[in-house]
A protein has these predicted regions:
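Non-catalytic, topology-defining segments of multipass membrane proteins
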Residues: 1-28, 33, 37, 62-168
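Short, function-defining helix-loop hinge/capping sites that tune catalysis or transport
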Residues: 10, 47-48, 91, 182
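Membrane-interface elements of multi-pass transporters and channels
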Residues: 15-16, 40-49, 82, 183-188
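Transmembrane alpha-helical segments that form the membrane-embedded catalytic/substrate-channel core
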Residues: 28-41, 71, 167-190
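Post-HEXXH active-site segment of zinc metalloproteases
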Residues: 47-66, 99
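Short, surface-exposed linear patches
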Residues: 58-59, 87-90, 97, 174-176, ...
Length: 190
């Protein structure tokens, strides 16, 4: 549902049915909800007890993440490591944006996760210790590359629309998710 709203917003803005500013608001709200279906898929909840429907988890999870330009496989693998090593500064991929001084710092840190190299180093070490994690990161990396290419094509074709319907909503939504789903639940924990 959320992805349909997001992609429909693009079509309506490009066709001139709704103004870009309205599309920005709709896209931002839609993108803020993009992680929830993926999270359910990461835990296998979308298929539930029906193992023959396990394919639904990554399919719905990945489609829902298109507005966030994220790989479901990467987020699944890192999220499982987060559960396995919650609050461990050496092994919890969420540690650097959960253990900060406040919500604003959480919003900033979650948007620059790979900027200072700490997360990349942690992921590299986790991959060395866990071949399945390394495989997931490789598969997800390919999806991430497709998103990079798609973002560049969109930016060249529809520059202002890409800025206000994809890039900025993604940054706002990532900040929101970092605050609400990472920082707030973990801020009082050791």
């Amino acid at each position: 549902g959320q992805f349909v709203v997001w992609i429909t917003t693009w079509v309506l803005v490009i066709k001139g049915v709704i103004p870009l500013w309205a599309g920005f608001i709709i896209s931002t709200i839609s993108t803020m909800n993009a992680y929830l279906p993926s999270h359910a898929g990461q835990h296998g909840h979308l298929s539930g007890k029906h193992k023959h429907l396990n394919w639904i988890n990554p399919l719905v999870g990945q489609i829902s993440l298109i507005p966030l330009s994220q790989s479901h496989e990467v987020l699944r693998a890192t999220h499982m490591k987060h559960h396995a090593h919650t609050n461990d500064p050496e092994k919890d991929p969420d540690y650097y944006h959960t253990h900060v001084d406040g919500w604003l710092q959480a919003a900033i840190e979650v948007n620059k996760q790979t900027g200072d190299g700490r997360l990349a180093k942690m992921v590299e070490e986790l991959a060395e210790d866990d071949p399945k994690f390394a495989e997931s990161m490789q598969k997800g990396g390919n999806v991430s590359m497709l998103f990079l290419i798609a973002n560049m094509i969109a930016a060249v074709t529809f520059p202002l629309e890409t800025l206000l319907l994809w890039w900025l909503p993604r940054k706002i939504a990532t900040s929101y998710l970092g605050i609400v789903f990472s920082h707030e639940p973990h801020k009082q924990l050791p």
